[in-house]
Structures are given as C-alpha cells and as structure tokens.
C-alpha cells in the first residue's frame, strides 16, 4: 500500500469516526419534548405566517471565519412602498440594533430585517440600503431605515475581520423562501453560543384555535446568551455541570445577546405589537436566562395583516386600519411565549460542535444526556397531557 493511499485511507477513517461521534441532531419535538399547549403551524417556523420568508448566507472559511447573515422578509412585495406595522421591545439594551428610533417613532418597518454579528452590522446595513435603492419603484428614495440586529460571535469568529459583504447580504435576501427554515449553525447563528453550549438560529410557530381568532404567531431567534439552562423546569445545566456562577473563575459565557423576531397575521397596531414583543421574554426566564449586563436582547414584532399595510405615499389623510381589542390579546401572548421558548431550544438542539478562531471549540448540547435528565424530572412526553381547545 502506497504512503499516499495510506494517508487518504486514514483521513477517510478519521472523518467517519468524527462523524459517528457527533450525536444525531434534531428539533426538540423529534425527541418528544413539547413546550406549551398550543399546536404549531405546518412547518413549526416563522414562515408559517403567510408571506414571511427567510434567507441565509453562512460563512465558514479556514480556521477563523464563522459567521453569516439571516434575512427575514415580511412580504414578497416592495416593503418600502408597503410598510408593515412593527414594534421593538428592549430586554437589555447592550446592543447595536440599527433602525430602532424610527420604528419607535413611526411604528412600522420599511426594509427586511437582517441579523448578523456586532461589528458587521454597519456593513450589512450598507448592503441592505443598496438592495432597497435598487428595487423598482424606489428610484426617488433618499432615506431608508435599515433594520439590522446583531449578536457578538467573537468567541468563534474573527469578528474584527468584518467578513460579511454586501454580496452576502444580497444572496441572503435573494435566497429567502417560505417553508422549513435551516436552524443551528447557519446564517447569523453560525458562530453564536447559548447557555454554555453552541447556539444558533432557531424557529417555531403557534396556531390559535378558530374561536380565539385562528391567528398564527411565528418566531425566529439568534441565540447568543448565558445563564442556567432549564427545559420544561428540569435543571439541565446544573445536572450537566455547565452553568453560570458554577465556579469562582468563571468559564461559562454569560454575556452575548439574543435577537427575537416575531411575525403574526393578527391585525395589530404598533402598540399591541410592543405588548406582544414583551411577552417573548417570559421564554427567556423559562430557559434559564436573565439578560445579563453585557447582553443585547431585543424583540422585534411585526404584523403581516394586509389591511394594516402603510403605503409610502397616499392622498388619504386618514388610514382605515384594524387593531385587535385588548381583551383578545391574551391568546397571542401565550402563543409568543411558547414559540419563543421552543425556538431557543431548537437553536441549541440543531446546533453542532464548532471549532473556530484560536482553535477554540464550543460543544453542542449533548442530546442523549439531556433526554435522560428530562426523563429523571418527568419533563418528557408532555404530548400525552391535555392541550388547548382545537376549535
């Protein structure tokens, strides 16, 4: 056997062994874990809200580049010309979210929502503006409020290199589609960490019963924060021996950030969308986070309801818009809590081990160990319990 053939055979064997060592990954429902009592949408994703699409560009190059961009489009038209109602809730403001002040002032968004890493946010905004100015119908546009969220992936990525380009932004937007959404180490979640393990992109949705409006709520998260991991009340992080304040010399990464994007087809004003966005943080506490000092935690909610779109130009001084009554908001509040919590957990269950800058490795959550812990605390098989009304 030649030396060259021996080297190739050894490399293939190493690759196979490494692949076998990686646990089978999947979404939490694939392993019998259920959050809440409401049913999911068809794909259990933010794209279950009609018209919403998601596109991603992942950058994994050499030993140091572990980053990307994720694009969420509220509808398939020109969003600058047909804006949608929106609101932002700030859980902890240690972040660089772009576009926030105009959204708070006017209550709408006029671009797709893009997610990336902290130092790339201005470059991504630049690419997003290029995209918007080039859209047919925007030839006279001289002001664009680009919406770009971020988390700091510098633990695995050469963040100072600012590797996401305008071309990557355009490719992510052009790749946007409905249906299932990639999760884990993809797009803006490529280099993120969550609750002591590899984080990433996660998504989930909830469908309300007809008697409660029949509306859909979809959530997409970019997880990059710390704490003490809990799943359905089970102390998973403590059982695994990986949690915040475990030891005097802190190894657990507690700072980071989380971006939460919420879509719904319910007819909501910016006021009620902010109320909806607030409830997403119930999920934060449920999974064991507390919005640390250095965590930039933002929730952006928008409504796709076509009756509430805001034309960029109109001769009408008064708009006819619908807003769900306050007394009918509670089912949506529950839906956003459930979907956010499941999206966070999906981001971790779908993530895989990653080695990045300076040879640093972040392990994925060990699923089989986690399932044993959940079994120990009777936190599995919730699908056998009574659920919400179906009609």
Short names for language-model regions:
Residues 22-391:
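Alpha/propeptide regions of enzymes that mature by internal proteolysis
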Residues 1-22:
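Bacterial Sec-dependent N-terminal signal peptides
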């Amino acid at each position: 056997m030649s030396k060259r053939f021996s080297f190739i055979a050894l490399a293939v064997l190493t690759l196979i062994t490494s692949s076998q060592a990686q646990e089978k990954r999947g979404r939490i429902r694939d392993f019998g874990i259920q959050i809440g009592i409401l049913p999911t949408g068809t794909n259990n994703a933010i794209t279950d809200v009609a018209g919403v699409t998601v596109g991603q560009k992942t950058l994994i190059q050499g030993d140091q580049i572990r980053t990307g961009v994720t694009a969420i489009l509220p509808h398939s038209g020109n969003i600058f010309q047909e804006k949608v109602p929106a609101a932002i809730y700030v859980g902890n403001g240690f972040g660089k979210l772009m576009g926030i002040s105009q959204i708070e002032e006017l209550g709408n968004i006029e671009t797709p929502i893009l997610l990336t890493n902290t130092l790339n946010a201005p470059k991504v905004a630049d690419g997003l503006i290029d995209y918007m100015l080039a859209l047919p119908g925007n030839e006279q546009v001289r002001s664009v409020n680009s919406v770009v969220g971020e988390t700091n992936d510098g633990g695995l990525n050469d963040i100072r290199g600012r590797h996401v380009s305008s071309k990557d932004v355009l490719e992510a937007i052009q790749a946007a589609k409905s249906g299932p959404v990639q999760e884990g180490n993809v797009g803006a979640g490529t280099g993120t960490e969550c609750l002591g393990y590899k984080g990433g992109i996660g998504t989930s949705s909830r469908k309300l019963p007809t008697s409660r409006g029949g509306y859909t709520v979809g959530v997409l998260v970019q997880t990059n924060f710390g704490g003490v991991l809990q799943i359905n009340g089970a102390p998973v992080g403590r059982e695994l021996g990986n949690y915040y304040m475990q030891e005097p010399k802190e190894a657990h990464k507690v700072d980071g950030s989380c971006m939460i994007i919420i879509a719904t087809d319910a007819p909501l004003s910016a006021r009620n969308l902010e109320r909806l966005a607030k409830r997403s943080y119930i999920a934060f506490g449920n999974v064991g986070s507390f919005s640390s000092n250095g965590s930039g935690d933002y929730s952006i909610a928008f409504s796709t309801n076509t009756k509430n779109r805001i034309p960029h130009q109109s001769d009408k001084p008064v708009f006819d818009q619908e807003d769900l009554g306050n007394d009918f908001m509670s089912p949506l509040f529950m839906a956003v809590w459930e979907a956010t919590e499941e999206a966070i957990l999906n981001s971790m269950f779908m993530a895989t081990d990653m080695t990045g800058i300076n040879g640093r490795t972040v392990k994925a959550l060990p699923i089989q160990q986690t399932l044993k812990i959940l079994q120990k605390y009777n936190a599995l098989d919730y699908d056998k319990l009574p659920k919400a009304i179906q009609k």
